[in-house]
Amino acid sequence: MDKNIQVETVVNKLKNIAEKKIKDQKYNTALAAISCAADILYTFNQKYTDDDLEKLTSDIGDNLKSKYNRANYKKCTDTILVYDGFGLDTRGVVRMYLNALGLNEYSVYYVTNSTVQDSIPTIKSMCDKYGIKIIYIDMADYEKCFMQLSDVFETIKPKAAFFYTTPYDSAASAAFHAYEGICTRYLIDLTDHAFWLGKCANDYFLGSREMSAYIEHFERNIPKHKCIKLGVNLLNEKVTDHSGLPFDLENTRYVFSGGALYKTLGDDNNTFYRIIDHILEEHSDIKFIYAGTGDNSELKKVVEKFPDRAFHLNERKDFFYIIQHCTLYLNTYPMFGGMMMKYSALAHKL
């Protein structure tokens, strides 16, 4: 069976499950089915949006919001909610937003997963610096996540909320949808190049490049006035811990690349890895580092072929140090990296 048809078949089955469970008021299972369908669409990336999934998510938000009395909800003029569905200390985008909001002296509440309490020291330090309050919620259970996030909205009554999360965060999408017309909601379009869920949950969509707006409007059918280009102020924090690096970066010639590994896959000619292979074959004094996570099936072949010269590292806080000392930064292909390319330009390594 054709892969596209297989994906459509599985996604339709999950939609049917979600629809049935919504009728049965089994919202946890319905949200799980929606999340699974969105994850599949993100992984195979055959389209950028799915109105059926958005409608199902909206229905859940509408049904569950009846548990809250909104008669006394008044916007708090200086309070901002920042929802982070990742909870990753190595991701720069959320720290850029927190830094900007903190510098402008907003009253900010940062909401993230309860499982990351002990693994986000950099974010905690920034929150302490600006007096940003951190709230942890249980994201392991879909309905509980919806309820706890809604409780945060009800408690702090934010004027605006930022939606920064995975492409398949059904619970948060439903919760944000429930506050339509009450709170101004902004989706940070981190995954501007692929499918994501949350169109129903936000008023405005913040992209950092022209491609973001093009796909938002022409592929996701978002009205132009809702598409906002908001550049990022790169955080260039000095990191002194360089432990775990495979060699002395300051005295070695090497090519560096990084980001989510799926951005290097899907090209019939395997161009990205052919370039790496050619460089290492032709230049015996050059090494290669890739920093990032995901499907490493192709990268593993390079590492095995050049065991002392090609290295795969996890996401690192000192990635800018690695960029600064590389001989060449190689962008990912066929999907270009956005933030990494900005940092490579800052380091004059393009």
Label every PLM stretch briefly.
Residues 139-145, 293-297, 310-323, 336-337:
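Conserved active-site histidine-acidic residue motif and adjacent donor-binding/catalytic loop
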Residues 90-100, 217-308, 312:
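Conserved catalytic-core segment of nucleotide-activated headgroup transferases in glycan assembly
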Residues 79, 176-193, 203-210:
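Active-site proximal beta-strand in glycosyltransferases
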